[in-house]
A protein has these predicted regions:
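Rossmann-like AdoMet
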Residues: 1-83, 87-148, 165
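A mobile, often basic/glycine-rich helix-loop segment
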Residues: 152-169
């Protein structure tokens, strides 16, 4: 059954759903969602992102992460987390620049927050030659908080469903 048919059936059986729930399902449903069923990003996809235009963007993010780690006192462990890493280009560029500080790379626990299996595969390919191998989680609440976190989130807000609130008084 198609996603459209499943959504229609669910609405008939249980009543209205919020726009946010509807958009979330349309984007991330594992069997019919936009990000789960097609390459959305890149030359063959529907859009490109800043890291795909120039490696300088990701490299500057990498240098910023190293500097932030140093300002944190160069802790022995730090979680470098990217939310919605697309095809992995930004992180690949960031890690390449971060090689200037091998101590930073030794401290990094790289975590990518990505629910889409096709995008996880693309990220794995992009980061295959990296000095650090990522760990994937599906959501931010899966990140451990026993070490400092450096969070990167480029172009992720436009992938989130909007929630509407109405003030009545």
């Amino acid at each position: 059954m198609s996603l459209k048919d499943r959504l229609a059936r669910e609405i008939v059986l249980t009543g209205p759903m919020t726009v946010a729930d509807y958009v979330t399902r349309c984007l991330h449903d594992p069997e019919g969602g936009y990000y789960a069923t097609r390459p959305a990003i890149g030359a063959t996809g529907d859009f490109i992102t800043a890291p795909m235009i120039s490696q300088m963007f990701g490299e500057l993010i990498g240098l910023w992460a190293v500097e932030l780690w140093r300002r944190l006192g160069a802790p022995e462990r730090v979680r470098l987390v990217e939310v919605g890493p697309g095809d992995g280009t930004l992180m690949a560029d960031a890690l390449r620049a971060a090689r200037l500080d091998p101590e930073f790379l030794r401290a990094v626990d790289l975590i990518l927050i990505e629910p889409s299996p096709p995008l996880r595969e693309a990220q794995a390919r992009m980061l295959a030659d990296s000095d650090i191998h990522p760990r994937w989680v599906a959501s931010l609440d899966r990140i451990e908080t026993d070490a400092p976190v450096i969070l990167i989130a480029n172009e992720v807000l436009d992938c989130l469903p909007a929630r509407q609130s109405v003030k009545t008084e």
